[in-house]
């Protein structure tokens, strides 16, 4: 059994999700102690518990410690990941519903299902656009297209918007099984081709997304970027608003966003998202700090070595690298000075 210290590094949920994914893929049983010890409320929250049970379900695994607030977990996979049709609902584990990010559940089970024999269809319910988590828009426009370059074939479709704190969103995920993963060489991003933006509001006046879109377009055009904005007013179970920007370079993709909240103007929400994008643009790097740690797992499972340059070497990145190496699947080297990540898969 592989013992994992959940308090290592940034002490967040990434340690748990990566461990669950690799345990399901390799069949290695794991014990995690100190789950999310670095967070204000340690232990398993609704989205983490849903991810735990989802990982166990797709491989008929056994669990101990799978409860809200638990800081200790044992997971014994049960004989290979099984492709199929699955439904995972974050609100089921927390009475009254939850906006727990379903994208974190998605990222936990995606690679195991992509490597399984047969195709899978997964319905996920909960929060689709939640602060401090990848949004479904980011998954659709950045994460999955980048993973497609590495051989992973998956599509996501947003069925209903789900914001914090209500949730109530739904996503349908299609995963092609039997994928053969290849490496990624991404040291240069090339020229910026375009920025695409989506400003959206549910159960709120139409002027809110339009103001976000107008402000973002003005800021990005002033900065000399080619931009195309779309403003949408959608139906939802609760009010919510946000703006989501995707920058397409010749060799890479990146995405940033901002969320509306009380006493924060639509224009300010747009300024926050644009500020993040412009700051990244100035780094010259092809990979943003969030995608940097998300690419590690497919890279270490690939049949070729990978290397890519990142905008920032975050604690999230180095923590995830340390967890992956616990499974003996390869060697990850992070050059802090050059901001280059090199992954030598054991399959090479």
UniProtKB/Swiss-Prot annotation:
Enzyme Commission (EC) number = 6.5.1.4
Q: Alphabetically list the UniProt keywords.
A: ATP-binding, Cytoplasm, Ligase, Nucleotide-binding
The record's annotation in Pfam families points to: RTC, RTC_insert
Name recorded for this polypeptide: RNA 3'-terminal phosphate cyclase
**MF-aspect GO terms:** ATP binding; RNA-3'-phosphate cyclase activity
Q: What does this protein do?
A: Catalyzes the conversion of 3'-phosphate to a 2',3'-cyclic phosphodiester at the end of RNA. The mechanism of action of the enzyme occurs in 3 steps: (A) adenylation of the enzyme by ATP; (B) transfer of adenylate to an RNA-N3'P to produce RNA-N3'PP5'A; (C) and attack of the adjacent 2'-hydroxyl on the 3'-phosphorus in the diester linkage to produce the cyclic end product. The biological role of this enzyme is unknown but it is likely to function in some aspects of cellular RNA processing.
**A GO term from the CC aspect:** cytoplasm
Locate the residues binding ATP. Answer: 107, 290-294
């Amino acid at each position: 059994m592989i013992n994992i210290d959940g308090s290592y590094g940034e002490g967040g949920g990434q340690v748990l999700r990566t461990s669950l994914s690799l345990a399901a893929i390799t069949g290695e049983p794991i014990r995690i102690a100190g789950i999310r010890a670095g967070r204000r409320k340690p232990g398993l929250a609704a989205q983490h518990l849903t991810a735990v049970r989802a990982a166990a379900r797709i491989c008929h695994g056994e669990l101990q410690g799978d409860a809200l607030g638990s800081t200790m977990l044992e997971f014994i996979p049960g004989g290979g990941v099984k492709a199929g049709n699955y439904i995972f609902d974050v609100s089921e584990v927390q009475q009254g519903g939850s906006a727990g990010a379903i994208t974190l559940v998605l990222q936990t089970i995606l690679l195991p299902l992509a490597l399984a024999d047969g195709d899978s269809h997964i319905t996920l319910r909960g929060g689709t656009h939640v602060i401090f988590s990848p949004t479904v828009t980011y998954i659709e426009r950045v994460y999955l297209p980048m993973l497609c370059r590495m051989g992973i074939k998956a599509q996501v479709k947003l069925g209903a918007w789900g914001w914090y704190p209500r949730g109530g969103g739904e996503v349908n995920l299609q995963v092609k099984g039997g994928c053969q993963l290849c490496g990624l060489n991404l040291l240069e991003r090339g020229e910026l081709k375009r920025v695409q933006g989506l400003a959206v509001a549910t159960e709120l006046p139409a002027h809110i997304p339009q103001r976000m879109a107008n402000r973002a377009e003005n800021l990005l055009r002033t900065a000399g970027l080619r931009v195309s904005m779309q403003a949408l007013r959608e139906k939802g179970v609760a009010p919510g608003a946000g703006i989501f920007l995707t920058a397409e370079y010749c060799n890479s993709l990146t995405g940033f966003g901002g969320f509306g909240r009380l006493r924060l103007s639509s224009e300010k929400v747009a300024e926050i998202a644009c500020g993040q994008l412009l700051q990244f643009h100035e780094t010259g790097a092809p990979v943003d700090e969030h995608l940097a740690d998300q690419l590690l797992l497919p890279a270490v499972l690939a049949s070729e070595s990978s290397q890519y340059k990142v905008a920032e070497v975050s604690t999230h990145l180095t923590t995830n690298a340390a967890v992956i190496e616990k499974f003996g699947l390869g060697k990850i080297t992070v050059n802090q000075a050059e901001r280059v990540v090199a992954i030598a898969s054991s399959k090479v």
